[in-house]
Amino acid sequence: MSIPGFGSAEKVNHTASSVTLTIPQSYEWRIEVPFNRILKFKVLTGIVEINGTELANNTEIQLSGTKTYLYSPVTDAVIEYVLVENKDDLSLVSASDEGFVEYLSDESNMDSILNLHMYLESKRQYTKDYNFSSSIDQQQSGPKVLIIGSKYSGKTTVSKILSAYANKMNNTPVLVNLQPRDGVFALPGSLTATPISDSFDVESCNGYGLTTTSGTLVHNPKQPIVKNFGMADFNDNVDFYKLLIEKLGIAVLSRLDQDLNIKNSGVIIDTPALTSKNFDIVESMVSNFLIDNIIVIGNERLAIELTKKFAYKSTQLNIIKLNKSSGCIEVEDRFIRLQQEQTIKEYFNGNFKTRLSPFKTDIELSGLKIYKNVLTKDLLSQMAFLPGGDDFEKDETNPEEDPEKKQLEKYYQAIEDPNSSNLENSIVAITHLPNNDKKLGKDLLNTSVLGYIHVSKFDDQKKRLKVLFPFPGVFPKNVLISTNIGYNE
């Protein structure tokens, strides 16, 4: 495995020829950079943004494995770029990667997004003025925005832009990620909530940045609240997904009450692809986060149906339609998986700009409590073998049966026989919950993630795990959760 920052891409850079490009005002320079290439560029003149984050002039930016665009909002901008071979991540790339794609487009929906931002900013300003002269128990919250839409509609891009623009106005909105496929200041398989107090790091593999690490960072490190879902698709266990939405909603609303600046700034929520068939999930998001603005991207029918279904909240809930950008494209499953692997690698090793020093060691299996998230299909398979009429409900004839344990079994099950087949090459979440917790059932559903380890090897004979930590230290004796997210170094 190559160490980020020690590849030989710099040698190629001296021989590659640079290209100078002018991005006209209000144009987008749309780019698709494969994982086997690195796009290095500088903004020479003008103002250029990536997903709302303004780029510094005459400062080299590196992008790899991304599909995004550069936007010139005010005047014509001039950039200079060069494309070089990616020598750092040979484990992720292959000769079958698509080539570099770039083109200019004047079909931008940035004006609509800017209008939306100004609307939300007016709400924030009203909230600030009101809260300034109000007692604590009468204070209001800034706009809480839920962004929904169909697949490949640009929801994540809009959430980044709105968060970045809000931060430019000295706000600290809470960015909530309810798309477990993506790792937002965490690893894939998680749901997170993060106060955005600084600009995003556009050079990180997913365009967000790093959390608190053992090294120094250019941007302020983010400290998210992380809930472990353990799967990449919310359909793998919808009941568990809705339960985590409820738990994360409680944590976010509590965070708003603790910090007036965050409360004034509000919440911005990114979601997976949802349709009218997922109304129960949308309703869960609206009720648990006290949503007052729903942004529907590129799906007028969905907007109309939501307006009808939320008619009883018409005075409390605004449903806003937003045009889908013509730059939205379908993303292949292989590309998504490569991004997930890169996110995991960056969590442990850092990137070309921030090199981290992960710690590899062996730990004893004895004394560890390891749980595994439950897939709905596996739970239904178990129920199929029960006697007719039986289920997992409490048995009234058995007074010793623990109802909390029964509830836990729908979401987590203890790994009774940890071995190489169920732990090797997996990502394991370390919870805040100590091993000796007496209310394990209830507390495991309420707890958050402290960090992650990677189990690279399991010795079935010696019952020892070879694990990778993000930093050196004593392994905490906390409850562990083995996720469905696999990873090979």
From Swiss-Prot:
Which GO MF terms does the UniProt record name?
ATP binding; polynucleotide 5'-hydroxyl-kinase activity
Superkingdom of source = Eukaryota
User: Under the cellular component aspect of Gene Ontology, which terms does the record hold?
Assistant: mRNA cleavage factor complex; nucleus
Question: Which keywords fit this entry according to its UniProt record?
Answer: ATP-binding, mRNA processing, Nucleotide-binding, Nucleus
Q: Where does ATP bind?
A: 28, 152-157
UniProt keyword Nucleus present:
yes
Q: Which Gene3D superfamilies match?
A: Clp1, DNA binding domain (2.60.120.1030), P-loop containing nucleotide triphosphate hydrolases (3.40.50.300), Pre-mRNA cleavage complex subunit Clp1, C-terminal domain (2.40.30.330)
Q: How does it assemble?
A: Component of a pre-mRNA cleavage factor complex. Interacts directly with PCF11.
PANTHER family the record matches: CLEAVAGE/POLYADENYLATION FACTOR IA SUBUNIT CLP1P, POLYRIBONUCLEOTIDE 5'-HYDROXYL-KINASE CLP1
The entry's function note states: Required for endonucleolytic cleavage during polyadenylation-dependent pre-mRNA 3'-end formation.
Task: Give the family this protein belongs to, as stated in its UniProt record.
Answer: Belongs to the Clp1 family. Clp1 subfamily.
- Under which name does UniProt file this protein? mRNA cleavage and polyadenylation factor CLP1
